[in-house]
From Swiss-Prot:
UniProt GO molecular function: DNA binding; excinuclease ABC activity
Lineage: Bacteria, Bacillati, Bacillota, Clostridia, Eubacteriales
This protein's name: UvrABC system protein C
Record localization: Cytoplasm
Pfam family, one: HHH_2
Quaternary organization: Interacts with UvrB in an incision complex.
Gene source species: Clostridium perfringens (strain SM101 / Type A)
Primary site of residence: cytoplasm
One GO BP: SOS response
Family named by the database record: Belongs to the UvrC family.
UniProt xrefs under Gene3D superfamilies: 5' to 3' exonuclease, C-terminal subdomain, GIY-YIG endonuclease, UVR domain, UvrC, RNAse H endonuclease domain
Record's keyword annotation contains Cell membrane: no
């Protein structure tokens, strides 16, 4: 039993992060504190000053933990990371929280690759972005691929290395095949330098030279060649134009405002580059009606800029935000030069901020309208489903199950959940098959259903014993309907498992046609055809697609992990991180065997003792 009185007494007089948990051990809130002792104790003092949301949270706190940090800045960074990790119920959650994509050029390689990534790291490579418009970054990448035949493989290719056979991309003119030695490092880097200059927007000589080439081709009546050069010029100009929107310069500014209704809110950001609004983003934030605007915007800024690497010099907000000095310091460290958060009182900047707020209202209204429309469509589909199956009530919560394996290897089971016709990702579960050997879908399904309902009954008993509220996101909430991604056989397995546990839940299966498309439902040993294009068929298709996607994704992740399990696991001093670094650098076990001591030491994370261990292992 957690001793609140004792734990509150021994709280340190230092900065840090506190983590609130409920009776099932779930993290429900993460907060930072300048002084942990003062901040945490506030929650358990007179609740009259607390908002409804805070009072509800305090009721659910069964225990708390804390992490002491050296500074308030460290506490802020740790808080951001923990919120992203746990997505606690009572923290402000951005509906569209994400890391923005960058274009990465692996300049620490002899023959660099150019690709899109959402992971920014100070690793010596070149990054361009972040691109707040996800579509734009892929358009830019598409144009780069069209203009420059670069390699896309992950092979460790070094100049003068042993050549390998060129892949299909070489034969269709999409790659110059440095792996086969068909292009020198110097020639390849000419293309890379051009790309860097185009993305930087710093070199106009490329277009000038191309225009001269085009004019010369036209004079010599080589119109086809001239047309190709013209298309190349247009593509480069288009890339440069798109890049302007995402290049943060000294005088650039972001404008952030918030609009809330009686329950939820929308945060809107306008990006102003060279005095023009070049882009915008909006984020829906749920259940913030009781939260002060200054707190919401403060949390939003920490979360929003925590996911990007480039920050403007000035950010305009409607009022002074909570911990403004600390947030400015956090952003300044991230940017590398001073960042200001300002409140415009009048003039153009105030007018623009008003426009941001108006747009936030419009986006929130549209979001709510779409939600209502979607809710009606989903309800209609659930009514149709209940009617078709003859259920007494709407199947508000549907659980769907699938098994995935390739020739019996890495068998996995997955459970996806739909509530009120919408996917509820937080309740998804995945199971690695333990007791079944070989490709046996029926027995694999029996195992995962048994594990699911066994866990569920244990939780239900625990909740009843402690007189607790049912918690969301665990096994204790049972479905109104189970949907099997298979026919009569899988339905019967599910019914047998439920009978063993003494649970009554209706179970249906999906019947497919010759083209493996769902044509109907099997229920009570009868096949029921569903009209194609109906709301019910759309719902069933969404459920089926989602359970397939989730199963395949999990299966692929297990397969990839298994592939990485190699002979390297037997080498002393070589852990998972070092294995990955070795495979990324050398591409294969054979190349690692042939590597010199100097090449091994040049691998990230490989010290002298690890390199000696590798050499000794392969020479023995």
């Amino acid at each position: 039993m957690f001793d609140f009185q004792h734990q509150l007494k021994i709280l340190p007089d230092k900065p840090g992060v506190y983590i609130m948990k409920n009776s099932l051990g779930e993290v429900i809130y993460v907060g930072k504190a300048k002084v942990l002792k003062n901040r945490v104790r506030q929650y358990f003092q007179n609740s009259k000053n607390h908002s409804e949301k805070v009072r509800a949270m305090v009721k659910n706190i069964a225990e708390f933990e804390y992490i002491v940090t050296d500074s308030e800045m460290e506490a802020l960074i740790l808080e951001c990371n923990l919120i992203k990790k746990y997505s606690p119920r009572y923290n402000i959650a951005l509906k569209d929280d994400k890391f923005y994509p960058f274009i990465k050029i692996t300049t620490n390689e002899d023959f660099p690759r150019v690709y899109v990534t959402r992971n920014f790291a100070k690793d010596g490579n070149r990054y361009f972005g972040p691109y707040t418009n996800g579509t734009a970054v892929y358009e830019v990448m598409g144009l780069i691929k069209k203009l420059f035949p670069l390699r896309t493989c992950k092979k460790a290719i070094v100049e003068g290395g042993e050549p390998t056979r060129a892949c299909l991309n070489y034969h269709i003119n999409l790659c110059k095949a440095p792996c086969a030695g068909y292009i020198s490092k110097a020639e390849y880097w000419k293309m890379i330098d051009e790309i860097i200059n185009i993305l930087n927007g710093t070199d106009t000589s490329i277009i000038k030279n191309l225009k001269l080439e085009m004019e010369k081709a036209a004079e010599e009546l080589e119109f086809e060649k001239a047309a190709k050069i013209r298309d190349r010029i247009l593509a480069i100009e288009l890339i440069s134009e798109k890049q302007k929107m995402f290049t943060v310069k000294e005088g650039d500014e972001d404008f952030i405002d918030l609009y809330t209704d009686e329950k939820d809110g929308c945060a809107q950001v306008f990006f102003v580059r060279e005095g023009k609004v070049t882009g915008r983003e909006h984020f829906m934030i749920e259940n913030i009606s009781d939260d002060p605007v200054k707190e919401v915007i403060s949390s939003f800024i920490a979360s929003f800029y925590g996911g990007t690497a480039q920050i403007p010099k000035t950010i305009y907000v409607p009022e002074e935000i909570e911990d403004q000095e600390l947030i400015e310091k956090f952003l300044t460290e991230k940017r590398g030069s001073k960042v200001w958060i300002k409140v415009p009182k009048k003039g153009d900047k105030k007018n623009l901020l008003d426009m941001v707020r108006n747009n936030a209202k419009i986006m929130l209204d549209q979001f709510k309208e779409k939600m209502v429309e979607e809710k009606e469509l989903n309800k209609s589909a659930l009514i149709e489903l209940a009617d078709v199956l003859g259920l007494d009530s709407l199947p508000t919560r549907i659980e769907a199950y699938d098994i995935s394996n390739i020739q019996g290897v890495d068998s996995v089971g997955t459970m996806v959940v739909f509530e009120n016709g919408k996917a509820k990702n937080s309740d998804y579960r995945r199971f690695k098959i333990k007791s079944v050997k070989g490709p046996n879908d029926y027995e694999s399904m029996r195992e995962i259903l048994s594990r699911r309902f066994s866990h569920g009954l244990e939780e239900v008993n625990k909740i009843k014993e402690r007189n607790l509220e049912y918690s969301k996101g665990k096994f204790c909430i049972f479905p109104d309907l189970i949907m099997m991604d298979g026919g009569k056989g899988q339905v019967n397995i599910a019914l047998e498992v439920l009978k063993d546990f003494g649970i009554e839940i209706p179970v249906c299966g999906l019947v497919k046609d010759d083209k493996h498309r769902t044509r109907g439902i099997i229920f009570n040993n009868e096949e029921i055809l569903i009209r194609r294009g109906s709301g019910l068929m759309n719902l069933i298709t969404r459920v089926q697609d989602e359970v397939h996607r989730y199963a395949i994704t999990y299966h692929r992740s297990l397969r990839d992990k298994r592939t990485l399990h190699s002979i390297l696991e037997d080498i002393p001093r070589i852990g998972e991180k070092r294995r990955r670094n070795l495979l990324m650098k050398f591409g294969s076990i054979d190349n690692i065997k042939k590597a010199s001591m100097e090449e091994l030491l040049d691998t990230p994370g490989i010290d002298k003792r690890a390199a000696e261990s590798i050499k000794q292992y392969f020479s023995s």
